[in-house]
């Protein structure tokens, strides 16, 4: 296979990477015929990096940094982005935090200026802390009022117990209420340093021009002698057994999530696991959707989910149904999981699931924002860019035999589960569910 030269158009379009002093990485992907540009500062710190006493600090800080900098108020920041019709936002996850902007390519210098100012110079002023504390508490209350969102946090806590990935990203009303300005400032100073950061951009972007902008705005933070932090490995160990959690609530429906612990994203059978998840409950033709909804009409919403972290993961099933149908939903769900664990999926199901993964991957990367996100996550998680073509090849190499071996290995494990609905005690829950949790 010939090497790509700089004159080769394919080589010119390949993602580029520069490591600056201090360990800050800049990765870009130029997309021809795209007028927009997306840029994000990815920080390799998330909710799993907090101590239990400051649960929610990463998310609280993400809110707080937008309130003011030494040269801009929150209104100044908002008006500057509104004036160019762009988007400026952020999100916090278990293992990272991202501050990003989506603008016209010609407005990229402004976007870099704003994002860098927020990330590096957010003031954490005392008055701002109290105002934003109330905002976060309202967000927690809103999440608790949404059964599906509340159940997602309950399930991970039931599955992982005291392990950091089992704690809600948003924290709790109790932890956020007592968090101090000093704790938030300490978190910012310790973890928001260049070696923990990746600046990723995609779209109408010039790599060398972006590197120059980053040098300008990160300035004195780029101290020589530091190297990028290696991709996260995690502890590799989750103590304790999964459990069953019930929250009794007067509601029209019963909501349930149940699932198993899996290896993390670096597992050699990671894509076979993704195929298994897709065949189980990842689409309209999946086993669970067909058996629970289409054939029996027991629930409107039923699906599977796969969450992968550095050292662990969760394969789960979610369903919502009328309380009187809960036992039937659990009976059918248990039958499907037992059948797949025992007999596996078919060659046809494997092919459909692989096609769904391939199509979803490519269709989900047709804009600059999604490309930027892929660049940032790949750099933080793996320390390098993983091309779309590489991922597509990995999916294509999955065989039905590998998927079924993964199913036998994982689906016989002890399950964790969370239930939210009008049920008075765990003893009143379906026997099939209690048996799976053990």
Curated annotation (Swiss-Prot):
The membrane-spanning stretches of this chain are none
Q: Which molecular function term from Gene Ontology is one that the record holds?
A: metal ion binding
Stored InterPro entries: Metalloenz_LuxS/M16, MPP/UQCRC_Complex, Pept_M16_N, Pept_M16_Zn_BS, Peptidase_M16_C
Please list the cofactors this protein needs. Answer: Zn(2+)
Q: Where is the active site?
A: 62
| The UniProt record lists the keyword Hydrolase | yes
Entry note: cofactor: Binds 1 zinc ion per subunit.
Binding site residues for Zn(2+)? 59, 63, 139
Q: Is the keyword Metal-binding assigned to this protein?
A: yes
Q: Which SUPFAM superfamilies match?
A: LuxS/MPP-like metallohydrolase
E.C. numbers: 3.4.24.-
Picking any one GO biological process from the record gives: proteolysis
Q: Which UniProt keywords apply?
A: Hydrolase, Metal-binding, Metalloprotease, Protease, Zinc
Q: What PANTHER family does the entry give?
A: METALLOPROTEASE (PTHR11851), MITOCHONDRIAL-PROCESSING PEPTIDASE SUBUNIT ALPHA (PTHR11851:SF49)
Q: Which family does it belong to?
A: Belongs to the peptidase M16 family.
Q: What is this protein called?
A: Uncharacterized zinc protease MT2852
Q: Which organism is it from?
A: Mycobacterium tuberculosis (strain CDC 1551 / Oshkosh)
